[in-house]
């Protein structure tokens, strides 16, 4: 099991390195930070001094190796906008992003899991059709469209909630609900599919034939087995919390990590962008590892297989 987890960590770190490397190259080839930050009217001497100060006058391969050498020493670079540590700049926004993503995760689970189970248990009834209709709508409608619709209804027409900002807890309601509903739709669809597959297995019919109450069959046999594939999509949603906040934070002017990423890309604040991408990659790595561990807890057979594979 340890060998298996180490291999997963190694592959994940390689993936994160490739993502950061691709971003490193693309950002440096897509525009000159000196022009964007100083403005096109700045004198040539200012441009040269800026590039020299930030090492942008060196070949890109030299910048690349210097960057990763600094990363391995714990130096993730400084923001080109204000000179502060990029890690500090991003760290200041993390609590604001967590303030909407964690409640949104609760909404996803609280709505998506029961809805998916209900749709499977009442397959081909009006309950199933209603849940799937809402799920498909939430799954296919982009989050920024849903956010704009909710803002139009609750902020503009009804005036119950603010449409943007972060001054009070009320400002967090619409972005939280937007992210929560989109994720709930995804979880409901996957949970329904997993439950239907399990309910069609022979051991479910055998348990029913033995005279067990249907609720006991569902609770003791169907739900634990359906949880395994459902954990995969939940792990993905947890891992993409920061990435998923980019659009929603921009729509509602919520000053979290997602909006910071949009501004940093537009301003070519290279170190800040790379720190955020590193954060996103590590979050996904941690979520995937947690899901792998939960697999072994939910289904010991998987743990045994991995132990055998690692031995």
Which sequence ranges carry the predicted segments?
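A hydrophobic, multi-pass inner-membrane permease signature
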Residues: 138-146
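Hydrophobic alpha-helical transmembrane segments of membrane transport/permease proteins
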Residues: 15-65, 155-174
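Short hydrophobic, aromatic-rich alpha-helical segments embedded in or entering the lipid bilayer
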Residues: 42-75, 172-173, 204, 253-264, ...
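Alpha-helical transmembrane segments of integral membrane proteins
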Residues: 2-4, 16, 88-127, 143, ...
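An internal, D/E-rich "acidic patch" concept
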Residues: 57-113
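Hydrophobic alpha-helical segments of polytopic membrane proteins
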Residues: 6-8, 13, 150
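Residue-level recognition of pore/gate-forming positions within transmembrane alpha-helices
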Residues: 12, 43, 136, 152, ...
């Amino acid at each position: 099991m340890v060998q298996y987890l180490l291999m997963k960590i190694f592959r994940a770190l390689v993936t994160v390195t490739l993502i950061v490397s691709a971003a490193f190259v693309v950002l440096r080839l897509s525009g000159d930070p000196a022009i964007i930050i100083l403005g096109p009217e700045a004198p040539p001497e200012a441009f040269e001094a800026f590039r020299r100060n930030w090492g942008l006058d060196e070949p890109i391969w030299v910048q690349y190796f210097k960057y990763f050498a600094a990363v391995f020493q714990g130096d993730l670079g400084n923001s080109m906008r204000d000179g502060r540590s990029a890690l500090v700049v991003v760290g200041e926004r993390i609590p604001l992003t967590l303030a909407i993503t964690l409640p949104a995760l609760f909404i996803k689970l609280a709505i998506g899991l029961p809805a998916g189970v209900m749709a499977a248990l009442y397959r081909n009834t009006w309950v199933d059709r209603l849940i799937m209709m809402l799920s498909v709508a939430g799954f296919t409608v982009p989050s920024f469209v849903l956010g704009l619709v909710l803002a139009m209804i609750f902020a503009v027409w009804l005036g119950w909630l603010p449409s943007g900002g972060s001054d009070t807890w009320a400002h967090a309601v619409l972005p939280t609900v937007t992210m929560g509903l989109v994720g709930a739709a995804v979880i409901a669809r996957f949970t329904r599919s997993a439950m239907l597959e399990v309910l069609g297995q022979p051991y479910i019919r055998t348990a029913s034939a033995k005279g067990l109450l249907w609720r006991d069959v569902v609770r003791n046999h169907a739900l634990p087995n359906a949880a395994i594939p459902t954990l995969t999509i939940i792990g993905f949603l947890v891992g993409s919390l920061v990435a998923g906040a980019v659009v929603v934070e921009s729509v509602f002017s919520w000053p979290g990590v997602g909006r910071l990423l949009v501004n940093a890309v537009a301003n070519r604040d290279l170190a800040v962008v790379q720190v955020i991408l590193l954060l996103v990659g590590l979050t996904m790595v941690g979520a995937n590892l947690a899901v792998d561990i939960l697999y072994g807890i939910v289904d010991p057979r998987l743990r045994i297989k991995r132990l055998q594979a690692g031995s």
